[in-house]
Amino acid sequence: MNNYQVKAIKEKTQQYLSKRKFEDALTFITKTIEQEPNPTIDLFELRAQVYEKSGQYSQAELDAKRMIHLNARNARGYLRLGKLLQLDGFDKKADQLYTQGLRMVHKMDPLRPVLKKVSQRLNERILRTRPVLDLFRILPREVLLCILQQLNFKSIVQCMQVCKHWRDCIKKEPSLFCCLDFSCASPRSVNSRDRNVMAVARYSVYSKDNIQEVIGLEKLGILTPTKALLRSVKSLKVYKTISPLHTQSTDKLYTIWTPFSELHYFYCATPITFSIASKILSCCKKLKQVELVDLIPDLIFDSMDWDKLFNAESVPLALKSLTFIRNQKFPFHHKEQQFLKDLLSASPYLEYLEASYQSDLVAAIKKYKINLRSLIIIDEGVSNTVKDLAFLPQSLTTLIVKPCNPASTILCPYLFPTNVRMESLINLELFLYLRLSQNDIDNVVKFLTSCYKLKKLVLHDSLALAPHFFEIFASLPELEHLEIPDNVALQNKHAIHITDCCPNLKYVNFSNSISLDGSGFIAVLRGLKELKRIDIINCDSVSRDAIDWARSKGMQVTVASSLPNSQPLGTKKIRLI
């Protein structure tokens, strides 16, 4: 049957329908279908239309199903059957049918956009008419408040969109809006800046102007303090940026944060210059914890005005924790060193410091008598000369020396103090230089033996220390956490000696120690009564039977990395000399 014949049949059928002669139209189209050896979906669509006009929905649905059966890639059958199901009151079945149609219909079908639009419209109508279980009328307020406080901020906003009653109840709880966390905001939300400003203004009203924490506000495209946040300046104590700020005027970035004079904690993942950092620190006098993880130099270092902001005679800062990490893509300038030195001189209460290594860092700590409790040194690998850590505060409980990139190695040895006993040091993590000289080895060994109260020890790239393991661990009787990964020289005798000297060990990591076999593994398990977990990743000499025996005793044994597609722990980037 060609297109002209189909067109003639349609015109004659429409004539019957216009005169409301449903029986004549039905007889005509049915006779045509019976006479046609291979009826097309056009004929069944015409008859379904006639059935629909005459109110015979069940018969019309059968013809619509025949249309889908004849050509499942054509949208007309799904549109016809979906409409009939809705007329019969089966909205859910129609919704499922439209979903199936969107999967099956060809992308080039001209009616596919119509099918998609009809599906979306039906879905919206189902959501509007769907009965909502009103938990706010069933559960007590205290129970609901406890539940909502476990949700993240995005989930709370979604709950407000369920219905008007939910929104009215939630916005009456100021405690739910003390922390505005926009870290889950969609990247597209930056395009709706004005709407976002109004939303933040509403949250400020809901919180009774008591917002205490803001996270990721830059994801909403808001680069300056809004009126909503300025209302709550007196209460804002935590501000975190988690993504870069795309702005032309980087020299004006400090205006975003300086109005919040009551800030206690400031975390900035946004690249900011030293001048901006100095203005923030000088304006927010009550800052106790600052994390600057991507500091970049000013365009013209010599024109910076921060060199007079901090010194020993200025008003001391309230800082207790400082993370000060520079961006390595930019060359080092001597004024960066002076900036950190001045900052330390104005921070007498500092207890935690994480910073890129600088030559006079230890001298500044000693000069200004800073009683640090935790010191983390980031080695940038810029210089190959020996780096001085010969002075460490007696108040220090945690010391970490690590490379800027976990997959890299330390490019030079560190000089540790050996003339004093580190009585307060409890946690120690060291990445060692791979080519230690004998003097450097002696220095590290003396330092480790002086830390006799250590409870946690992590040694990376410790191959050079293997001959001294007996001396080192004999001095660490209180050790509870030990990690010596990537040491191919670690043998059964060393493991047994560690077991005898450190009976309180609860966690041990011997990963990539290929010389350790099943007998040494069993000896460690039997000797350490407090042991709860042991890692032996890539220790192929330890048999499966020994591992199964350990697990049968309730021991947690890790034999494979939990990170997908991760490289072996011993694989490092080594700069060849």
Curated annotation (Swiss-Prot):
Disulfide bonds: none annotated. One of its GO terms (biological process) is ubiquitin-dependent protein catabolic process. TPR repeats lie at residues 6-39, 41-74, 76-108. It is found in: Mitochondrion; Nucleus. GO terms for cellular component: mitochondrion; nucleus; ubiquitin ligase complex. Keywords: Mitochondrion, Nucleus, Repeat, TPR repeat, Ubl conjugation pathway. GO terms for molecular function: ubiquitin-like ligase-substrate adaptor activity. The keyword Repeat applies. Coiled coil: none annotated. Residues 138-180 form the F-box domain. A part of the E3 ubiquitin ligase Skp1-Cullin-1-F-box (SCF) complex. Interacts with cul1, mcl1 and skp1. PANTHER family: F-BOX DOMAIN CONTAINING PROTEIN, EXPRESSED (PTHR38926), IM:7136021-RELATED (PTHR38926:SF72). Has a role in substrate recognition in the Skp1-Cullin-1/Cdc53-F-box (SCF) ubiquitin ligase complex. Required for the maintenance of telomere length and transcriptional silencing at the telomere. Also required for chromosome segregation. This is F-box/TPR repeat protein pof3.
